[in-house]
């Protein structure tokens, strides 16, 4: 079976790796064009390109997916199937090209969390489970027929990074299984509507921007704690807070927290520092304990180290 693999970030590498290491016929890899990065604006390769170069795979990096030259090259490869993992929205002329279609790996239990940031939003919303889904591409984003699905638990100690890493491995295995059942003509793809009943509340996973990452100090301590977990380590929750001895608020990135539900008389949003060892923010129903943070121009550090540096 001739496979074209499409992906860009680290999350996609594990899926490509499992195919290459198990001798599946990957005839080409499609990834984003190189982008200038850093102070020197040096061109940076995607994680997928780095791996593809290492394995001497054919690499295509179209600026536009409807480019005639790119489409001609895709067609000449005569792929039986295309696999998409963390790439971009494909036009029909691309996803409809292979004889067996194109499937995508999505990091949620579809139809829940359609969109760009499913791992983050599942944790932010306090879900206890998530998973990975393979589905055939169609016109509407993340709505195609489900091929395979597997669940994992979201642990209280998890953040977006740990769930990302587990789903990356689980998803790679799901990609391999999906290719096998398609190759064996054993697919029983299910319409996503079969997973929706009258009391289903569909949650979305929209793209996260810097302003999305600001902590809402009017929420409960548990909600804020989950928000921090869901944004950690990337793109990172932040809040602006008045530090001791300062007249203007400082923006702090917050990577790790704990919380305590308790009645108190402190002003909401107030920072309370105890013996330069612990720091907590007063919220409406308790305290949010800051564990790992980053101040502007500083490295990421534990709260005790940060407090020792305050004057």
Predicted regions and their residues:
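Internal anion-binding site segments
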Residues: 198-311
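A residue-level signal for conserved active-site and pocket-lining positions in enzyme catalytic cores
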Residues: 7, 29, 52, 82, ...
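Internal alpha/beta domain cores that form substrate/cofactor-binding pockets in large enzymes
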Residues: 2-4, 27-29, 58-77, 82, ...
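Amphipathic, non-transmembrane alpha-helical secondary structure
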Residues: 13, 17-21, 71-75, 92, ...
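N-terminal beta-loop-helix "entrance" segment that forms/cooperates
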Residues: 35-53
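N-terminal Rossmann-like dinucleotide-binding module
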Residues: 1-39
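Donor/substrate-binding cores of folate-linked one-carbon enzymes
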Residues: 22, 32, 81-207, 211
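Structural motif corresponding to alpha-helix initiation and N-cap regions
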Residues: 13, 42-45, 67-71, 88, ...
């Amino acid at each position: 079976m001739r496979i074209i693999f499409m992906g860009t970030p680290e999350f996609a590498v594990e899926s490509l790796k499992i195919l290459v290491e198990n001798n599946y016929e990957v005839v080409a890899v499609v990834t984003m064009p190189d982008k200038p990065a850093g102070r020197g604006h040096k061109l940076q390769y995607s994680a997928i390109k780095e791996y593809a170069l290492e394995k001497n795979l054919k690499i295509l990096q179209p600026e536009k997916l409807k480019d005639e030259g790119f489409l001609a090259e895709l067609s000449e490869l005569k792929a039986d199937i295309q696999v998409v993992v963390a790439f971009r929205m494909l036009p029909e002329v691309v996803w409809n090209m292979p004889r067996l279609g194109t499937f995508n790996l999505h990091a949620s239990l579809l139809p829940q969390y359609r969109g760009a940031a499913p791992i983050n939003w599942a944790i932010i919303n306090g879900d206890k489970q998530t998973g990975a889904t393979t589905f055939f591409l169609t016109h509407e984003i993340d709505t195609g027929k489900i091929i395979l699905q597997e669940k994992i638990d979201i642990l209280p100690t998890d953040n977006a990074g740990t769930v990302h890493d587990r789903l990356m491995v689980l998803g790679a295995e799901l990609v391999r299984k999906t290719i096998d059942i398609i190759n064996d003509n054993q697919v029983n793809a299910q319409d996503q509507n079969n997973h929706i009943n009258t009391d289903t509340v569909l949650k979305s996973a929209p793209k996260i921007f810097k302003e999305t990452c600001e902590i809402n100090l009017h929420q409960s301590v548990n909600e804020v704690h989950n928000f921090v977990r869901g944004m950690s380590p990337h793109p990172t929750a932040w809040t602006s807070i008045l530090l001791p001895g300062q007249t203007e608020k400082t923006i702090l990135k917050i990577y790790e927290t704990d919380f305590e539900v308790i009645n108190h008389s402190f002003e909401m949003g107030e920072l309370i520092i105890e013996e330069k060892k612990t720091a907590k923010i007063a919220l409406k129903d308790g305290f949010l304990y800051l564990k790992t943070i980053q101040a502007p121009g500083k490295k990421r550090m534990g709260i005790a180290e940060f407090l020792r540096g305050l004057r």
